[in-house]
Amino acid sequence: MMVTSSSIPIGQILYHDPFFFVKREIFYFFLIFLLSFILLRIPMSFWEKNSNLILIISIFLLTIVLLIGKSVHGSYRWINIGILHIQPAEICKISSFFYISNYLSRKTNEVRNNFWGFLKPITIIIIQSVLLLAEPDLGTVIVLFLTTLSVLFLSGVKIKQFFIIIFFVTLIITALVLFEPYRIKRILSFWNPWKDPFGNGYQLTQSLIALGRGHFFGQGLGNSIQKLNYLPEAHSDFIFSIIGEELGYIGCFLILLMIFFISFRAMYIGQQSFEKKQVFSGFLACSIGLWFSFQTLINIGAVTGILPTKGLTLPLISYGGSSLIVNLMAICILLRIDFEIRLSEHQAFPKGI
């Protein structure tokens, strides 16, 4: 609904078809809908056994996109295969969490008691991060590190090791910002977007105007002014601004409530998995919940001016084929984990009892 409303003007301008983007979104939705019948029948043991292979494939795609990828706004993030536009960074997220969950399910004691055991999964994330930064895609790198560190923390890593990694990651991110002029401009415009409202601060000021126009109940669905080619990426990274303008703060609250309900539900499913000794599923469910939470917080932070812009979509809401497919794939996996929990409870009781 919101993709339709926010993408009509840009679809008309770029493709002379106001419903261009929503048609593509519907296509991707039906694609994952058909795939869901397969995904829901794949046991978690399959993902656990093949997590390393999936990780290798994602790293291969991250490498290929730098060679043959399509450039959009100076970033090489998409591989075009016919009508499909694949974004390897989205695949990288879920593949990383497969790997981390598998690693922790096998080597929890090593991670807790040995610094090298703790460093191994971090090394894999660093390799992926180097490829992601070459695109460049700092937003995905931040989500990967935040989620990975949080899952490692849940696994019982020593606080000392945890803070050592946080310290070095902070130094690296600071260096990445300082050595890239466009990132410095983003930081400066984030601090005071109104100082340059028609330059570096343009996108943020237009976003804030959209949110300000919405007030509590919004201007009404379809009545946004900012989507009329004023706010860049109104249908993708900044769709939350259009939600605020059209549906008001009430609409924003309901959207956040929905996303965080899914996140907390994922964490609860993870807890149940641990209780049933399904360790891989437990770590994976927690990873998905944390991933959705962190990406949502970063997106909302960028839209409202609390954080610099990172180019991250709002999970399950923003336009984006790869993002939608991977997010719904994660939902299917959560449903499968929940199914296996219920199945184990049913099998725990003999018939007639």
UniProtKB/Swiss-Prot annotation:
Belongs to the SEDS family. FtsW subfamily. Its main location: membrane. Pathway: Cell wall biogenesis; peptidoglycan biosynthesis. Its EC number is 2.4.99.28. It is an enzyme of class 2 (transferase). The keyword Membrane applies. This is Probable peptidoglycan glycosyltransferase FtsW. It is a multi-pass membrane protein. Keywords: Cell cycle, Cell division, Cell inner membrane, Cell membrane, Cell shape, Cell wall biogenesis/degradation, Glycosyltransferase, Membrane, Peptidoglycan synthesis, Transferase, Transmembrane, Transmembrane helix. Coiled coil: none annotated. It catalyses: [GlcNAc-(1->4)-Mur2Ac(oyl-L-Ala-gamma-D-Glu-L-Lys-D-Ala-D-Ala)](n)-di-trans,octa-cis-undecaprenyl diphosphate + beta-D-GlcNAc-(1->4)-Mur2Ac(oyl-L-Ala-gamma-D-Glu-L-Lys-D-Ala-D-Ala)-di-trans,octa-cis-undecaprenyl diphosphate = [GlcNAc-(1->4)-Mur2Ac(oyl-L-Ala-gamma-D-Glu-L-Lys-D-Ala-D-Ala)](n+1)-di-trans,octa-cis-undecaprenyl diphosphate + di-trans,octa-cis-undecaprenyl diphosphate + H(+). Peptidoglycan polymerase that is essential for cell division. PANTHER family: CELL CYCLE PROTEIN, PEPTIDOGLYCAN GLYCOSYLTRANSFERASE FTSW-RELATED. It is found in: Cell inner membrane. The keyword Transport does not apply. GO terms for molecular function: lipid-linked peptidoglycan transporter activity; peptidoglycan glycosyltransferase activity. The chain crosses the membrane at residues 26-46, 53-73, 115-135, 137-157, 162-182, 242-262, 288-308, 314-334. GO terms for cellular component: cell division site; plasma membrane. InterPro entries: Cell_cycle_FtsW-rel_CS, FtsW, FtsW/RodA. NCBIfam families: ftsW, PRK10774.1. One of its GO terms (biological process) is cell wall organization.
